[in-house]
């Protein structure tokens, strides 16, 4: 279908069979749960779209044709300054399937070496070490407003047993 709007990151198309609705076509993204000893390395990130600062896992958008693991390595370094010795795929999720086809590839990063973040000009990000037990308890209590973060922490907890 011909897009009704195009941006540098996504484009908008009419929804098949529902001309009054639209679909956001997105290149996909990555989200990383960085494990640093008994802590998770999360970020405090100001989200202009909602006007709030959230505690969340590092994440980012895929470049056209980019391998998801390559994007995850890049985003972890940019947002936290960390380099991971070990990477594991952690599945995927669809963050907003009612209107957007973004597929979010999930990764666990372990064996971290911390360096300086390489933030983009518009990013307002602070890295935060959170004890795993505290993060798991917070996620179970619904304290994370960011869905990908809650899902990843709870999946990690269920994997640990």
Predicted regions and their residues:
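Short, well-ordered beta-strand micro-motif
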Residues: 14-16, 34, 108-110, 131, ...
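A generic structural signal for well-ordered coil/turn residues at beta-strand boundaries
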Residues: 6-11, 28, 100-103, 121-124
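Active-site-adjacent beta-strand/loop module that shapes the phosphate/pyrophosphate-binding cleft
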Residues: 10-19, 93, 97-115
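Structural motif
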Residues: 40, 52, 101-106, 125
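Acidic, metal-coordinating catalytic segment for phosphate/diphosphate chemistry
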Residues: 1-31, 36
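The catalytic Nudix box helix
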Residues: 57-89, 107, 121-122, 131
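Conserved Nudix-box catalytic region and its N-terminal flanking loop in Nudix hydrolases
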Residues: 24-26, 30-74, 78
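Nudix hydrolase/Nudix homology domain
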Residues: 97, 114, 122-161
């Amino acid at each position: 279908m011909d897009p009704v709007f195009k941006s540098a990151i996504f484009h908008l198309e009419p929804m098949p069979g529902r001309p009054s609705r639209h679909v956001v076509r997105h290149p996909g993204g990555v989200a990383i749960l960085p494990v640093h000893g008994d802590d998770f390395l999360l970020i405090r990130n100001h989200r202009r779209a909602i006007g709030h600062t959230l505690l969340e896992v590092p994440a980012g958008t895929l470049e056209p044709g980019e391998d998801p693991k390559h994007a995850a390595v890049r985003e972890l370094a940019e947002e936290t300054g960390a380099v991971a010795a070990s990477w594991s795929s952690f599945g995927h999720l669809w963050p907003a399937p009612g209107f957007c086809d973004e597929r979010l590839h999930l990764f666990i990063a372990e064996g971290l070496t911390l360096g300086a973040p390489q933030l983009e000009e518009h990013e307002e990000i602070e890295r935060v070490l959170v004890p795993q037990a505290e993060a798991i308890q917070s996620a179970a209590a619904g304290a994370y407003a960011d869905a990908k973060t809650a899902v990843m922490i709870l999946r990690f907890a269920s994997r640990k047993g």
